[in-house]
Every structure is written in structure tokens, then in C-alpha cells.
């Protein structure tokens, strides 16, 4: 089977969205299929990655490295970023210009290869539009629309962007042969626009060897990996609960919080400023190693956002460290932690509850306990096993047999 993957995030990008698509490419190739990738890059070039041909197409407007430099240097109002922001408002697609170049590359590859399957992934909109245009222009293939994030249901989008995305969402889910997403609640959202019933849940998963040996730090240490969002994801209640516990003498005064990878300014209470370590972003393999240097791994999930497993949650699963999730106790993260026995959930608005759960994690550290994880349940969430779900599904598709 010949497979074309169209996506904006791929190696060497250090992001969960890239890791998901890399897993599709890697495990499809290992299953004996020919895999070609068209993705965003710093230059127009072709490289070999894990046996896959990867065609990088440079965005004429703004590259990822340029955007990262602007964010790091606090350059918000530069011409290219302003133009990119206008594109998002006018077209609902910040990769509007890139997609014209990428379509030409994808079309030329279709002419040469006659792909059996095309997998496109959102966000941004561009990969789906390229796949849709390929189909409209007569290329025959089985189209998998990977919706790793919400489209019109996203709480991160403005009302104008939501209105702009709805017709695209309807067009994509109805034109594709299979819609894939990371959770059943998200699939349910996409079904409201769809005339067919071809939907499949493929979670993000983890892709490293599980770790059973547990090392306890000399001082109680909690860690958060990733970045916060000024409006939607805040550590304020975590900090407040932590601060109160230290004041009350319930936690040792030398207890630590490590924040690894956050790019936004944080308001750390002065009384715990010396307890909070801010560490710049690191590559994924280093993040996994650093997670072993914590006693509790923290998830803070977006207030009001339903049905989404934050990608770091799966990386946390195989570390054998307790996971503390500040999120909706009725949502999917809570269900996953209960199923795998890997940690605890508390509502992010419940300060008293957060304090109680921090103390529970502290007790585990103090008594050098290890949670009785259900490793069989956890192993189903390796990226390899999640990709196998899709491979098994495709093996039964009549169009491909």
C-alpha cells in the first residue's frame, strides 16, 4: 500500500502534533507500506526519515523557526506575524500561502506514485484542503482526515474563526472516507456534520520503553511539562494550594515545583518564588528523562475544554510516577487515570481538593510508595498499538483489498 501523509508538523519539530504523525509514518512503514510525507520545513528539500521519503516545503511567509524566534524575543508586532494573523482571520488558515506550494508538490507526487491512501491532519486547515483539492482534481485514493484537535468546537478560536471553519469542517468530514480523532467525545462533535459513519478513535499514545524503577527525590518535587495559556491553562490554583500547604506546615518548606517548557510569563507568588524552578523547553527525549527527576507529574487541563487527552498525559503514563490531573473529574482524563490506576484527578477550581491531592502525592513520596499501575491497560496506549488500530481497520476496507 502506498501512503501519502500531508501535515504541517513533522520531524524535527518538538511538538505532540508532530509525534503523532511521525508515529503514523513510522509504524505504517514498519508494517511494510511505502510512506511519503509532505510537510512544512525550513527549506524545499527531500530527506529520508525512518524509511519514509519526507518532502519539506518552505512557507514563503513565515517559517516555524522564525515564529519561534519571535515568540522567544517577544516580537509580536513584526510584519510577517501580522500578515500571518490577517491570513488566519481572512481565510481561517494561517498556512494559506504554504498550501499552494504544498499542493503542487503533493499533486506531482500523486502523478508519479498513484497513492492508495492519503492521510491529512488538522490543525492547521491546509493539509485537509490539499487532500480535498487532490480528490476534486480527479486523483483516486482513500482519504483519512485526522482531526487531532477540534475545529469549529475549539474554545481557542474566535467567533469569527468558528463561523469560517464550519463550512470547511462540513466539507472535509463528508468528503473523506474515514475521520480519525483522539477521543470519542471529539468524534461525536464531528459526526454532527457527517453523512457517513466512518469514524475511528486513535489516541496519541507514548513511544518509549516503560520505566518500572522509581527514584525518589531528596525533596518532594512536582513537575509540569509544556506551556500555559494566559486565558485557558493557568497554574494559579496549583500555586495557591501549594503555597497554603507550605504556610500551614503540611508540606516541607523545601518542596519544589518544576515548570519545564513554558514560554509565557508566569505570576509566581512571591512566597513560593524560591520553590518554583522555571526551565526552558527541551527536546522530547530529555523531557522524558527529566520526568524521572520528579515525584509527581502534573496535568492542568484547559477549563471548559472537553474530550481531549493532553498529549503529555500518555508520556506520563509509562514513567511509573503518580499523575495529578487538575481537570474536569467527569471528563476523559479522569477516566484514563482511573482505568490505568496511574494517578488522581481533582477539579482545577477546587483549592481544598487540590491541597488534599497534593498531600496524597506527598504521602506517596514520603513513604516511598509506588502506585499499583495496570501495565496491561497502559500498554494499549503505546503509539505502535494505537497505529495498529488504524492499520487493522484499513486491512478490512474493501477499496484497499
Where are the language model's segments positioned?
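Nucleotide-activated donor-binding/catalytic signature segment of Leloir-type glycosyltransferases, i.e.
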Residues: 251-255, 261-288
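A charged, aromatic-enriched C-terminal amphipathic alpha-helix characteristic of glycosyltransferases
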Residues: 349-353, 363-396
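N-terminal subdomain of nucleotide-sugar transferases
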Residues: 1-62, 178, 187, 245, ...
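Acidic donor-binding loop of glycosyltransferase active sites
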Residues: 177, 291-308
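Conserved donor-binding/catalytic core segment of Leloir-type glycosyltransferases
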Residues: 215-233, 239, 386
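Carbohydrate-associated surface elements
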Residues: 185, 202-205
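Membrane-proximal helix-turn-helix segments that form the acceptor-binding/catalytic region
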Residues: 23-24, 100, 104, 126-129, ...
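A conserved catalytic-core segment of Leloir-type glycosyltransferases
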Residues: 40-101, 109
Amino acid at each position: 500500500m502506498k501512503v501519502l501523509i500531508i501535515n504541517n508538523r513533522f520531524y524535527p519539530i518538538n511538538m505532540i502534533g508532530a509525534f503523532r504523525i511521525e508515529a503514523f509514518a513510522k509504524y505504517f512503514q514498519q508494517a511494510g507500506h511505502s510512506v511519503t510525507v509532505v510537510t512544512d520545513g525550513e527549506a524545499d528539500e527531500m530527506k529520508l526519515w525512518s524509511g519514509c521519503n519526507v518532502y519539506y516545503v518552505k512557507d514563503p511567509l513565515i517559517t516555524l523557526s522564525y515564529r519561534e524566534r519571535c515568540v522567544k524575543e517577544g516580537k509580536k508586532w513584526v510584519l510577517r506575524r501580522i500578515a500571518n494573523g490577517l491570513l488566519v482571520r481572512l481565510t481561517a488558515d494561517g498556512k494559506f500561502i504554504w498550501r499552494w506550494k504544498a499542493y503542487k508538490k503533493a499533486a506531482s507526487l500523486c502523478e508519479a506514485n498513484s497513492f492508495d491512501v492519503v492521510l491529512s491532519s488538522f490543525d492547521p486547515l491546509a493539509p485537509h484542503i490539499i487532500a480535498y483539492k487532490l480528490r476534486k482534481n480527479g486523483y483516486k485514493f482513500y482519504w483519512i482526515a485526522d482531526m487531532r484537535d477540534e475545529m469549529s468546537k475549539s474554545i481557542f478560536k474566535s467567533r469569527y474563526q468558528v463561523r469560517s471553519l464550519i463550512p470547511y469542517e462540513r466539507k472535509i468530514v463528508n468528503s473523506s472516507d474515514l475521520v480519525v480523532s483522539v477521543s470519542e467525545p471529539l468524534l461525536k462533535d464531528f459526526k454532527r456534520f457527517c453523512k457517513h459513519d466512518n469514524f475511528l478513535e486513535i489516541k496519541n499514545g507514548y513511544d518509549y520503553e516503560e520505566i518500572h524503577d522509581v527514584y525518589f527525590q531528596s525533596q518532594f518535587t512536582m513537575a509540569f511539562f509544556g506551556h500555559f495559556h494566559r486565558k485557558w491553562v493557568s497554574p494559579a490554583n496549583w500555586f495557591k494550594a501549594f503555597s497554603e500547604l507550605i504556610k500551614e506546615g503540611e508540606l516541607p518548606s523545601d518542596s519544589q515545583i518544576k515548570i519545564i517548557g513554558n514560554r509565557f510569563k508566569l505570576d509566581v507568588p512571591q512566597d513560593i518564588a524560591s520553590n518554583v524552578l522555571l526551565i526552558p523547553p527541551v527536546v522530547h527525549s530529555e523531557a522524558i528523562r527529566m520526568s524521572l527527576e520528579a515525584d509527581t507529574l502534573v496535568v492542568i487541563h484547559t477549563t471548559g475544554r472537553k474530550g481531549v487527552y493532553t498529549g503529555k498525559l500518555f508520556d506520563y503514563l509509562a514513567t511509573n510516577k503518580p499523575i495529578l490531573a487538575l481537570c474536569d473529574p467527569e471528563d476523559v482524563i479522569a477516566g484514563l487515570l482511573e482505568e490505568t490506576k496511574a494517578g488522581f484527578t481533582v477539579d482545577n477550581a477546587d483549592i481544598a481538593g487540590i491541597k488534599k491531592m497534593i498531600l496524597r502525592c506527598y504521602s506517596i513520596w514520603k513513604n516511598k510508595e509506588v502506585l499499583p499501575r495496570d501495565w496491561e491497560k497502559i500498554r494499549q496506549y503505546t503509539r505502535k498499538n494505537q497505529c495498529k488500530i488504524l492499520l487493522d481497520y484499513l486491512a478490512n476496507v474493501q477499496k484497499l483489498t
